[in-house]
Structure formats: C-alpha cells, structure tokens
Amino acid sequence: GTSGLISFPRT
C-alpha cells in the first residue's frame, strides 16, 4: 500500500 493520489496494494 502506497499513499498518494493513487494507492496500490502491497504485493
């Protein structure tokens, strides 16, 4: 998980 405009799941 990243924080910002778009969040991506941590894989």
From Swiss-Prot:
Annotated InterPro entries: Periviscerokinin (IPR013231)
Pfam families linked to this entry: Periviscerokin
GO terms for biological process, alphabetical: neuropeptide signaling pathway
Gene Ontology CC terms: extracellular region
Keywords: Amidation, Neuropeptide, Secreted
Subcellular location: Secreted
Residue list for modification Threonine amide: 11
Family according to the record: Belongs to the periviscerokinin family.
Role summary: Mediates visceral muscle contractile activity (myotropic activity).
Protein name: Periviscerokinin-1
Gene source species: Polyphaga aegyptiaca
